Amino acid sequence: MNIKHRVILSVSMVVLLILIGGPSGAGRQTQPDLVLVAAERSHTEVITSSQQSFSITAPADTPLENASIQLEVVAGEAVNPHLRSSGAVDCSSLKSVVADVVTPGMNSEEKALALWRFVMDACYHGRWGTSLDGLEHLNVYGYGYCGTYAAVLESLWWTAGLTARHVNIGNHAATEVYYDNSWHYIDADTRAFYLLKDNRTIASLEELNDNPELWTMLRRGSSRKAGKKQYYMTMHPNGHGRSPVYTNDFSMAKGDVMTLGWQSRGKWCLNRGEEGGKEPAWEPPYYGNGLFRFHRDFANPSQSRSGLVSSTNIDWQDGEAGYLHPQKAKQEASLVYRVKTPYFMPEATLSGRFLRKGTSDSLELDISTDNGKRWVTIWRAEGTGSVKGSAVTTQTQQVTTNVPWKYSYLMRLRMRAGKSSRDVGAYNLESASVLAYNLRCLPALRQGANRITFSDEAKASRTVKVTYSWRDDLPVRLSNDTPMEGEQVSVSVRVANRGAAEAVNVPVFLYFGNPSQGGVEIGRETIARIPAGGSGLATFSWKATRKIAGKAVNPGAQLYAVVNPDNRVPESDETNNSFSRTVKVLNPPDVRIPSESFIRFESVKERPQSLAIVATVRNLSNSAAHGLFLDDQAAGESVVVTVYDGNPAKGGKEIGRETIPKLLPLEYRNVSVQWDIAQIKGAHTVYVQIHPPVNLTRALGVKTSSTMAVPIDLDAYRRCKGK
């Protein structure tokens, strides 16, 4: 066969291979590529001043998922860098929390309740205590029990200018706040406060002890017995409890990067606190993990002194070497740096690039978590030449809330030159510390316009890059992004085809929970065709729930969409076929009059022939079993309250009505309707009817009204009034 024929045959074989899709995946380039992806967004701002603001605008009509915040020091040193977002409460200090939560014109009770509500939205009940410093608990942990809740709430009350106290009432730390010349018991851990019989005044612990029947919000069947309080404790008025004082001050120098992510990576604090015992703590249901990268490049020694605690026998003047080395041979040289962050550090990786010319030269990396009293060696150089060293340690678990140098550790490099001082040295030194923190206190973005403010206390010039990353235009969309438990919602899954060929009969599955971990299938649909470069939509009906086997899933319902799970449709990339999204499913509002004792008859001074019927209506939606936070409960919207003389089902006459625009979880309102009794005598039964909130009816269909009836003898009322 001549060359010409061999060439023609070769070309023909190539064409044939392309047409039949082989070999080595050549045909995959002409296949579809089915993907479930969101739009990945980011915004980077370069900061050069001590205070600088910028705007980030996210779509207002589509859900947004925060991904990460990154601070990178490009030049100089940032001292106590701080970010504030208009979309979140600023938790950098107790004062900033109060400034964001308390609004002008609030009275003392409104301030106390607003801060109480904030604490229940920022923290959740855990199985053990954490910090007794309010600011630390907010930022670092966010979970705990009564004592830690008290540390946060009482500190915030003091900061707001209120007087507060922490009361031990027997295996429970309670909080009271003082205003209007009396104490008032308001508890964030148990999510409760109780009203006196006037249905207006929040009771104190003394008053509850005197009237044990008030110990339930319903005032029905309380088995509580009056008891003595064991002792009183008052948190320090500057906002700190018994824990060593927490500070979120820290510095970052050139090369340092802090990344705060919205995902948990399986790294948390194993310490249970003072009362939790010695066993390792279970994984909290809700927390975030980030990373702090501490980096010192010794090519320019003059820029490597930030964070330096001490140096011994180090030649800082030899700039020509390109690395740091001992000043004198045969003597140990050392560098000690402090790594400090505002957050708990479950583990750290210490690393660097070093020089070790011979076996007589030595290099070691040590860590100290007790401020230099004790050192643990975690790495020794074994090779020679240019050596890369790295070691992972969980020694940082010891730097907890109980030590005054929280959250920091010392990193030490020790080296010794056997012959010449230049025979051993360090080109760079680095640590990567995993961070654990309360996600609810990060400066997050919200839908729509966001204003971000960076500030620090650096006196010299510095350049910092701030990058926000988030996802929007999610491929899994709901007809209602915050449905109520039991609400029927439509879920649409958008499948894009980024390949070069059309896809037909594309199967799409939707699960509640991760299908690889026992997730429950919601449904399956088939998209008839998705053209190359186009997209298709699969629509499902889902009865919203966050419960699996009767138990609520936190922090919300995980919806998993999977396209082409069995690879029935040949495609070029099978690694991008799933997407998950967390949906906050709300516990429906429970709006009612707790009991008959919450309906009172009061005289009207300016209208002696009228009687005021005052009904206390409360949203009792408060199931800690449904969700971690109070905002997992739904508000009641447009609640109509109608008062009747007689049973409305049997022709009772309407006296009047009032609409409550909104009732937040645990909020109450006193509805007052005036009844003209000038021509009415004798015994009557007043019925107060609570119509279901409009948003409840819209979500779950028509619901029956709740009715409470109380008798009144108008003749007896007049006789008492005459006295």
Language-model segments: which ranges?
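Conserved Ser/Thr-centered positions that define the repeating blades of beta-propeller domains
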Residues: 366-370
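Alpha-helical and coiled-coil interaction segments, frequently adjacent to or embedded
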Residues: 35-38, 196, 200-308
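Secondary-structure boundary elements
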Residues: 54-141
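Extracellular/luminal regions of secreted and cell-surface proteins that mediate adhesion/ECM remodeling
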Residues: 471-723
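A short beta-strand element within beta-rich, extracytoplasmic domains
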Residues: 343-357, 491-493
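Exposed low-complexity, polar/acidic, P/S/T/G-rich flexible segments that act as propeptides
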Residues: 407, 416-471
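Short beta-strands within extracellular/lumenal beta-sheet-rich domains
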Residues: 319-347, 394-396
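Hydrophobic/aromatic-rich core segments of domains that either
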Residues: 151-225
